[in-house]
Amino acid sequence: MVSDVRIGLVTGANQGLGRAVAAGLARAWGERGTVYLTGRDRQRVDEAAAALARAGLRVVPGVCDVRDGEAVQGLAQRIADRHGGVDFVDSNATAAISPGVPDADQVDDLINTNNLGATRMIRAFGPLLRPGGRLVVTASDFGTLASLPAHLHSRFATETMSLGDLDQTVRDYADAVRSGAAAGQGWPEWINIPSKIGQVAAVRIYARGQREQAMHDGQLISAVCPGLVDTRASRPWFTDMSQAQSPRQAAIDVVKLATGPIEPQMYGELVQRGRILPWSEPAAAVQTA
């Protein structure tokens, strides 16, 4: 079945930023679109979708644990069967980590959700993207090579590596954290930073391979940095949240990527409030005598 109604999907959407993005997109599309609000807990997903539906928004609850490859593929197949394709996908699901829990006890869930979950979503939903469609991964401004020591940059050589290579890189990183070797290898102290770099790398790798077709079809594939958002996941890590945005405020720029005109220069890049955050700093000019 092919639908002429716009179809959107947001993961990790039963709360926080994801819920605000789903609501904002449904509000922007109105009767012209339907948004799948997904998460891994059926009760929370159903409650969130029901609340938005009571507000007059066209949302559909969907249970999808991005840590489960079969669940992701199954949801993609159901949407393909019902609608023939998708117009907007936000891979937003993220694992909440705590300062009070050893990194070795958290890193597997973090990587499986944030990174392997993102590449599962990209592989499953990228091929379903319709002409003019957009696929974004929610990341952060930590997700650039500037956050990583130079000797580790080659681990994220997005110009040449595949998504499979990247999956192995982040698995190797998780292994290093669990074994206690990560610090000695020079990885950042906060495990969220390599995870965010991996998310942006996934976008860059997939976008590289799809560039010609995506440009022809007017599609956008990018990572988005919403900035500091006051959510359950962020509060334990920041003592001053006075400048944090509410989820609804932060969702505005994400929804713009779904509904506004496509800026070709944003393709494959990390975008924050309409501005591209460079993956790597330009090489310094070589001076000659």
Where are these regions (language model features)?
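Catalytic loop of short-chain dehydrogenase/reductase
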Residues: A95, P99-D103, R134-H216
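Conserved Rossmann-fold cofactor-binding substructure of NAD(P)-dependent oxidoreductases
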Residues: R67-H83
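A hydrophobic alpha-helix adjacent to the NAD(P)-binding/active-site core of NAD(P)-dependent oxidoreductases
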Residues: L110-I111
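A glycine-rich helix->loop->beta "capping" turn
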Residues: L57-R58, R78-S91, I97-D103
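C-terminal helical subdomain
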Residues: R120, A223-P226, T231, P236-A289
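Rossmann-fold cofactor-recognition segment
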Residues: L52-E70
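Canonical Rossmann dinucleotide-binding motif of NAD(H)/NADP(H)-dependent dehydrogenases/reductases
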Residues: V2-Y36
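Rossmann-fold scaffold of SDR-type NAD(P)-dependent oxidoreductases
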Residues: T11, G85-I97, N114, G132-S140, ...
